[in-house]
Amino acid sequence: GIRISEARNLQDTDVHLDENYLVIKGAKNMTDRIVPISQSLSNVCRQYVYYRERLPLKIDKKYFFLSLSGRKCGANHTIFRWFRLILKDAGIPFTGNHHGPRIHDLRHTFSLYAMEKMTREGSDMYHSMPVLATYLGHKTTQSTEHYVRLCRVMFPELERKVEFINQQIYPELEYG
């Protein structure tokens, strides 16, 4: 759920793999925040560090993510190029022209599933929104609402109820 620029600017001292969290400093809204990460992501990051330390280069130990030259991970276009290669390897078509998929879509997907999980665990949506906003580094919940759109995945029971009501109101339409 972090921004590309936040990942690029992570320093080794910001990454706490034993405790499963990142410290995001001076983000888009000039705020710092702590972002928990999963054990599986910590494990992947440990593997990354293992191989990074074996690069036959003089590396800049300050930044966590490095380019193949050993310096801070480069410009966004380099990251986008790698993302497109990953999409291709996964068999996911890249349509380009801002139609995606985009790296930023991962942030939207994370937001949607985080909200769905909180709702499934019994949290009220309106109480969950500020939690998610803080996690994403948003100043307001309005920014977060842009990321979280109500969808069928989040509320299957509501969908069933609405479908039943629609069948009563518009019986001539086919449903299901």
Residue ranges and their predicted role:
Residues 81-134:
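Short, basic (Lys/Arg/His-rich) helix/loop patches that form interaction surfaces
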Residues 1-9, 117-118, 126, 138:
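A short, glycine-centered helix-capping/turn motif at helix boundaries
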Residues 26, 136-161:
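Catalytic-site neighborhood detector that most strongly recognizes the C-terminal catalytic loop/helix
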Residues 29-46, 62-84, 98, 102:
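C-terminal catalytic core of Y-nucleophile DNA break-rejoin enzymes
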Residues 162-176:
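C-terminal secondary-structure termini that scaffold catalytic or DNA-interacting sites
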Residues 3-5, 9-43:
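Conserved tyrosine-mediated DNA breakage-rejoining catalytic core shared by Y-recombinases
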Residues 7, 40-49, 65, 80-84, ...:
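Short, structured motif recognition centered on aromatic/hydrophobic residues
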